[in-house]
């Protein structure tokens, strides 16, 4: 026969308080998340009008100097979008971090930026710490993302490099696809010779999870295996590269 001792009343009260506090904190977290998402949607919906309109006009205009002028305007709108996001991130989420190394960086150089990938918040974080310190980041994106409503067209207006990735099976069935991802990258990078940029790559190619780490048998403790092919292609196709 198993005997269960009664929990003292004082301990029961403490457990009850902890449980109620945890429920209250969870509720606040959910409210914060919903409010942050609402602010992000409002910010994106408002500024996307300017991005999409300027992007369409840039395609139509035949004069290169006017195209470059519109490109600079689009970048300014993109930086404003990040600034507004940074305001609510700082006020609501209150992140704390230490950032070093920007002393030797500027907005007039061409950069290739690399990072590991931990969560969906990584993009907001790198934008927050780099905005207006280096040229606006250009993220490698899968081509299918251009079809995301509103956001996809905004990314297109911001000259993000959209790449078509092919699986080994696709390449085996259709060998003519070999090298097309490299060609599309080279085409995207041509326009980057006109103004300074920071091309950004999550070199792991995907977010880190313990399962992915195990499946890859990665030699690194906290990283997935880097995808060297995309990195090598970026270095070889960038019209100019000052720093990595």
Spans of model-derived segments:
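N-terminal acidic, proline/glycine-rich, low-complexity intrinsically disordered segments
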Residues: 1-5
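Membrane-anchoring hydrophobic helices of lipid-metabolizing enzymes
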Residues: 9-11, 15-111, 117, 125
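Soluble catalytic domains of membrane acyltransferases
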Residues: 91-244
